[in-house]
Amino acid sequence: MATSHLTSRSLLVQAQYPISRLPSNLRLSLSHHKQPAAVAKRRRAPAPSHPAFSSVIRGRPKKVPIPENGEPAAGVRVTERGLAYHLDGAPFEFQYSYTETPRARPVALREAPFLPFGPEVTPRPWTGRKPLPKSRKELPEFDSFMLPPPGKKGVKPVQSPGPFLAGTEPRYQAASREEVLGEPLTKEEVDELVKATLKTKRQLNIGRDGLTHNMLENIHSHWKRKRVCKIKCKGVCTVDMDNVCQQLEEKVGGKVIHHQGGVIFLFRGRNYNYRTRPIYPLMLWKPAAPVYPRLVKKIPDGLTPDEAEDMRKRGRQLPPICKLGKNGVYLNLVKQVREAFEACDLVRVDCSGLNKSDCRKIGAKLKDLVPCTLLSFEFEHILMWRGNDWKSSLPPLEENDFKVASDQILNSKEAGSGSALTPIELVNNATSLKKCNLIEGAEKLEDSMKSSFENGMILGSACGNPGVCNSEGIDGTESSADAPIEFSPSNSARDLDPSQTSTLYCQSSLLDKSENGELIEMYPDRCGNSEQSPDVPEALTCLMGSSDEIHELETMRRNCKHLNGSDGVNSDSIVPSYMEGILLLFKQAIDSGMALVLNENEFADANYVYQKSVAFTKTAPRYLVLRHTPRKSHGTQKTEPAKNVRINKHLEEHKVSDHVKKKEIVMGGSRMQRNDHAREFLSDVVPQGTLRVDELAKLLA
């Protein structure tokens, strides 16, 4: 049997028995599913020959070169601020954006140039429907000087022109910008206009494109019913708000009366009329931005390739000075970058979360405003270098700047307070009189005193200098509080004791004016015991001057006495007014043990200073000590024990159950809020409990 030999063999070892291949009609089918028949491949239809159905080329668009004359088409000009469109009769050249156009000349165009206005003014073929025909019904134009009657139904509220000053009339035929604005607004009028528009929701929003051409008509639409247009700026345009305000005033014709942050209040003018406003054609297409030069050069000017790479490498490790939020107000960004350049030559700004185009626009603005050199935009950060030509905006520091500044501060404070001490030159002049004759010494001292009076200076204490009298009196001697400062010539130099030549005790009184109108200072009999130094001449017996000068001198002397009062400071030292508080704190620190004072001998020994420092450090507290902590005021709560406190103690002694304790804790808050008379504890009254009967039974059991 031919089939028995085939079935006795295993299918797994068929390769060991080479046999001839069976015909197709005798083969066994090992699969339970039939294979599907192969589908014939379909042929693609031939591509149409019409160019409208051809495949779109997905490559970079070809750049259109700019001709040498800078006018690639009729009415289109290439300027230093991008593309500009010129129309006959227009007051200025139109642009898509008046504030966000880069300050660089384009290199090439991305599309064929054309005028982006309506079909009436553009040579571009119209690809859509024809414009609708004009309405046969002519609607009357809105006139700001002919307002609808108030209270008319279906009419929105409209503000009249103005405000007008008293005695002035409105100008109906105002042509120029100055005539439309009229007289400058007063401060009260500005405050009233801003306050009326501050909370209004009707506003014009300016975004990343800045002030566009079509916004000019939108502003006039706001001015149709309101005197002030509220403009809110966000994003890139807020980097240079001064440029935004300038372009608004130049292109629209209004006046910026107030701006804070990113909000601008634009006033239309006193004589504004919507009927005679300038009408500009609207842009129906947004023109493609031209090709500008690269913002970031691979090798910036003034750097070598290695230096540029090293700066970019250092910039990756540099922390950013700030992080810009999306649609934020970047009003102080330029100022922050300039201040950062004072400390480091590289500055990094974090722009993560912003659009890529916004980051580059901000970098281009900073490049022109700071100015600086852009190094990279990687990782959504702006890396800037201040450049080799950078100059600090701070004034140069010199060696004597600190001394000059301190002298100026001292002089200003002395002049403001009116209390200061005598300069050293006055003392030196007084002590050097013995080397000069009487007349020359009198002239020198008189000149020095006059100069000190003019500069607002007064005589101070000089105990160690002979011939100078202290305004407060010398040690152990009391002087009159009202006596002016002068020298006593009662005794001659021959009668002076050598021990008395170092001090001078004097008192004086003022008499009436003489015939010449001069005030003469005389001395009473009680000055007979006072001694005079030979350094003081007899010609200085009187000091002549007007009564106003004497009164001013007396006032300054009293202020000096108040300055050198009992504040722990030596009276013969020159102490400025601004040092009083410091010296007082120093004295308090020594008295309280918070400061340690060493003399010259102790300070010279380093080991002694170290030992004293260690011992003084150990006396300080380890933790922070707050001496003036605010105390919590509990109102009129009394400190004596309340009734509920006694009940809680009684419950704790008897070990009350948990639910009873929880109830007492919950009700404790309400008990504390009772009146004071309910909290008072009376000894002759039995306290009433708040427990229920079953709980009392458990406790008594």
UniProtKB/Swiss-Prot annotation:
One of the GO BP terms on file: mRNA processing
Transit peptide: 1-77
Subunit structure, interactors included: Interacts with CRS2 and RNA. Part of large ribonucleo-protein complexes that include group IIB introns, CRS2 and CAF1.
Extent of the signal sequence: none
The name this protein goes by in its record: CRS2-associated factor 1, chloroplastic
Sorted UniProt keywords: Chloroplast, mRNA processing, mRNA splicing, Plastid, Repeat, Ribonucleoprotein, RNA-binding, Transit peptide
InterPro entries membership: CAF1P_plant, RNA-binding_CRM, YhbY-like_sf
Main location: plastid
Domain CRM: 183-279, 301-397
Cellular localisation: Plastid, Chloroplast stroma
Lineage: Eukaryota, Viridiplantae, Streptophyta, Embryophyta, Tracheophyta
Region CRS2 binding, residue ranges: 581-603
Gene Ontology MF term list: RNA binding
GO cellular component terms given for this protein: chloroplast stroma; ribonucleoprotein complex
Entry function: Required for the splicing of group IIB introns in chloroplasts. Forms splicing particles with CRS2. Interacts with RNA and confers intron specificity of the splicing particles.
